[in-house]
């Protein structure tokens, strides 16, 4: 009998966000691209979220897949993003990727920076 430990996804990568990433990758014409989500110092609350496309997964990266799209998180950023939800919204304020982070004790008004 084989026993495997199923680990829950470290974060939620919504179908809507994955669909938008897939659309952007198709526009770029490079099916090797993956979306990297990362945390950097800065912003009005101390840390800020960043998004970029990357062709390479680095040692220690966490990979989350949805709809044929891969999301990458480096080990340092991972600790701040566990349990978060990556989504994409379109509204009167414009269209943007949104991170709903249960680890953030405070966030700024724009939602792009936080403090753990």
From Swiss-Prot:
Its needed co-factors are: iron-sulfur cluster
Task: Please cite one Gene Ontology biological process associated with this protein.
Answer: iron-sulfur cluster assembly
Q: Which GO terms describe its molecular function?
A: 2 iron, 2 sulfur cluster binding; 4 iron, 4 sulfur cluster binding; iron ion binding
- The domain of life is Bacteria
For the keyword Iron, the answer is yes
Record InterPro entries? FeS_biogenesis, FeS_cluster_insertion, FeS_cluster_insertion_CS, FeS_cluster_insertion_RrpA, HesB-like_dom_sf
- Annotated binding of iron-sulfur cluster, by residue: 44, 108, 110
Entry keyword set:
Iron, Iron-sulfur, Metal-binding
Q: How is the cofactor bound?
A: Binds 1 iron-sulfur cluster per subunit.
Can the keyword Transcription regulation be found in this entry's annotation? no
Q: What does this protein do?
A: Required for insertion of 4Fe-4S clusters for at least IspG.
Could you give the subunit structure recorded for this chain? Homodimer.
Family, as annotated: Belongs to the HesB/IscA family.
Kindly provide the name given to this protein in its UniProt entry.
Iron-sulfur cluster insertion protein ErpA
- Where does this protein come from, organism-wise? Nitrosococcus oceani (strain ATCC 19707 / BCRC 17464 / JCM 30415 / NCIMB 11848 / C-107)
- Its gene is erpA
